[in-house]
Amino acid sequence: MSQAPNPEEEDDTIEIREVWNHNLEQEMALIEQSIDDFPYVAMDTEFPGIVCKTVTANPNPNPYSIHYEYNYDTLKANVNMLKLIQLGLTLSDEKGNLPTCGTNKQCIWQFNFREFNVISDMFALDSIELLRKSAIDLEKNNECGVDAKRFAELLMGSGVVLNDKIHWVTFHCGYDFGYLLKLLSGKELPEEISDFFDQMEKFFPVVYDIKYLMGFCTNLYGGLEKIAELLGVKRVGISHQAGSDSLLTLRTFIKMKEFFFTGSLLKYSGFLFGLDNPRLLTGSKN
């Protein structure tokens, strides 16, 4: 039996609000009430891993183009086959302050979805073992979790998506947005990467990927945990749970802005690490 995970740091000022089917409407109402004052949205997902890789037959002679097209084809194949398990959202203002939702604590959200069934659905074994070790109860998700279609309906009306005043903050986020786009559109991901980015620009007009931003920062390297450590950001909650990861993403982004960037970051928006937006690369956006 694996040992129960230990949060890296307890913080009595933070409440990770667990969202299940019974309280979905209530929690989405709180998010809708908060979004205007806290327009930075950090997002992370947990999903059943990567179960296949594709072989590209694209004759494109540009090896750089082949690289991101292959990455998208692999992402698309996996997202279309698999089901989202958990999604974390952290809302903040530009200084990193979080909503309190009428309590004496700062609130972040962790949505637990019901669709994935470990008995009948495909998954990567190492990913599921890691999620179990991170205290994600897949059976409880199955029984009590959020209905993904209802979540998508509520998110569409919340002001969080389709809103160019919202700044999405993520880390190496192609799969995160792939799963969210599949939920919001109710369809499989589009065949072509250019159509994927058309959907991205519609639903999430402003997106910052920390992994992409690292390329403009000195002496930053590694994954999210390492970057957070280098910037002096400590985790609250359990690693590999989406709520905790979304908060770590938000706080790391705030520190990066403070240390490495001045003024607007909009020129860095829309680039996802490993899935370079062909419209931005050719200067054809808008």
UniProtKB/Swiss-Prot annotation:
It comes from the Eukaryota. A divalent metal cation binds at D44, E46, D176, D245. It catalyses: Exonucleolytic cleavage of poly(A) to 5'-AMP. Coiled coil: none annotated. InterPro entries: CNOT7/CNOT8/Pop2, RNase_CAF1, RNaseH-like_sf, RNaseH_sf. Keywords: Acetylation, Cytoplasm, Exonuclease, Hydrolase, Metal-binding, Nuclease, Nucleus, RNA-binding, Transcription, Transcription regulation. It is found in: Nucleus; Cytoplasm. It is an enzyme of class 3 (hydrolase). Gene3D superfamilies: Ribonuclease H-like superfamily/Ribonuclease H. The modification N-acetylserine is found at S2. Its EC number is 3.1.13.4. The keyword Calcium does not apply. Its cofactor is a divalent metal cation. GO terms for cellular component: CCR4-NOT complex; cytoplasm; nucleus. GO terms for molecular function: metal ion binding; poly(A)-specific ribonuclease activity; RNA binding. The keyword rRNA-binding does not apply. Belongs to the CAF1 family. PANTHER family: CCR4-NOT TRANSCRIPTION COMPLEX SUBUNIT. Component of the CCR4-NOT complex, at least composed of CRR4 and CAF1 proteins. Ubiquitous transcription factor required for a diverse set of processes. It is a component of the CCR4 complex involved in the control of gene expression. This is Probable CCR4-associated factor 1 homolog 2. It comes from Arabidopsis thaliana (Mouse-ear cress). The gene is CAF1-2.
